[in-house]
A protein has these predicted regions:
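Active-site beta-strand/loop signature of hydrolases that rely on acidic residues for catalysis
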Residues: 7, 23-41, 101, 130-151, ...
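Metal-dependent phosphoesterases centered on the DNase I-like endonuclease/exonuclease/phosphatase
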Residues: 30, 51, 122-210, 214
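Structured beta-strand-rich core segments of catalytic domains in phosphoester-bond hydrolases
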Residues: 37, 42-109
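Active-site-proximal beta-strand elements of phosphoester/diester hydrolases
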Residues: 1-9, 98-110, 142
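Conserved beta strand-loop-helix elements of the APE1-like EEP
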Residues: 60-75, 193, 204-225
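Surface-exposed cleft-lining segments at the edges of enzyme active sites
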Residues: 81-82, 107-123, 158-162
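Active-site beta-strand termini and strand-to-loop segments that position acidic
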Residues: 70, 94-97, 220-221, 239, ...
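N-terminal, active-site-proximal structural segment of metallo-dependent hydrolase catalytic domains
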Residues: 1-47, 51, 57, 62, ...
Length: 250
């Protein structure tokens, strides 16, 4: 089973940069996107052979998640069941017979870390949600998790210690999630590879490859041995992120 996850930084904008061609070329069984920045029906994209599921933020033009699936899930859940966290279209869960697929766009702590305190409460609530699912069947988490976990996951570690996405607090929450029974699939398959999934539009970061690895596939430990590939598609353009891939034998 091949899965793709991609923060498209606005689906309507990405569609003008060959998203449809990239979607077809990647040929995923489940294709998840984050930061759709739209309400249902606002994008002219209906790939043949797929069923679409979307979850939009209440605030128009902001956040949002979506999935396209070759095989329809048993059930679809929006949000994590916590009122304070379920207004921004951030978590879309698909239940299949043998696993849950959780598509997530984690809140950014923002410039000046204005939203770091909220981010910490989100992290705890989201981890609890994943553990509730994991108690029933294995979990595959994908998405833009807005954290570079370790120094190998970011080009300029020293100068970003207080930047949103690389604070000690955010990194510790990722460590806590993995310690709760989950595996970062790219790092498991490529323990020493330096590869990034996001580049700021500022400071000529793409030209310098001054990137961050903040897009993930994370799986329950008990299915980690089923992973056969975990890749980052740096050759695919259209957003400030690139797609990430998981192939798993489930």
């Amino acid at each position: 089973m091949k899965l793709i996850s991609w923060n498209v930084n606005g689906l309507r904008a990405c569609l003008t940069h060959d998203f449809a061609a990239s979607f077809a070329a990647l040929d995923a069984d489940i294709f998840s996107v984050q930061e759709t920045k739209m309400q249902p029906g606002q994008a002219d994209f209906a790939p043949e052979g797929y069923t679409e599921y979307t979850y939009s933020a209440e605030k128009k033009g902001y956040s949002g998640t979506a999935c396209w699936c070759k095989t329809a899930p048993l059930a679809v859940t929006t949000g994590i069941g916590r009122e304070e966290h379920d207004h921004e279209g951030r978590v879309l869960t698909l239940e299949y017979p043998g696993f849950y697929l959780v598509n997530c766009y984690t809140p950014n702590s923002q410039d000046g870390l204005k939203r770091l305190d909220y981010r910490m409460t989100w992290e705890d609530a989201f981890r609890a949600y994943l553990l509730e699912l994991d108690a029933k069947k294995p979990v595959i988490l994908c998405g833009d998790l807005n954290v570079a976990h370790t120094e190998i996951d970011i080009k300029n570690a020293k100068t970003n210690r207080m930047s949103a996405g690389f604070t000690d607090q955010e990194r510790a929450k990722m460590t806590e999630l993995l310690a709760a029974g989950f595996t970062d699939t790219f790092r498991a398959v490529h323990p020493d590879e330096v590869k990034y999934s996001w580049w700021s539009y500022r400071f000529h970061a793409p030209e310098k490859n001054a990137g961050w690895r903040i897009d993930y596939f994370i799986v329950s430990n008990r299915i980690a041995d089923k992973v056969t590939a975990a890749e980052i598609h740096n050759e695919v353009f259209g957003s400030d992120h690139c797609p990430v891939e998981l192939v798993i034998d489930l």
